[in-house]
């Protein structure tokens, strides 16, 4: 019984240290492997975390919170949300059977203070969901390997840090 209590305490401490990872994707066992290293440094069966309905739902929640414009198909977050359940199921099946194809990004130009324009690519909502699902799986694996002085596009860091 003491061993089970100690394991539970350790799992809770690990969960706190890795609070920024997506809990729908990363189990306590996987977080422990992140901390102690994976035997041989090789991860197996990560694609099932990306393609799972649970992982896609978590990614959808992140995309919803970020909002943003529609992609080349002009579908908005609200439009996708009206049929999110069936759309996520379909996306999961497409990813699993290899028929998923991302759409081209919509190109827009944002004016800069100097009068020039900055190009910006806007992916379709469904493609943003897949990107978020992939990020949720890969980011915790690679985050610890990045240089501590690197701040761009990293969780909990920014250009102003």
State each model region's role.
Residues 2-4, 8-13, 17-19, 24-161:
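Conserved pre-catalytic core of RNA-dependent polymerases
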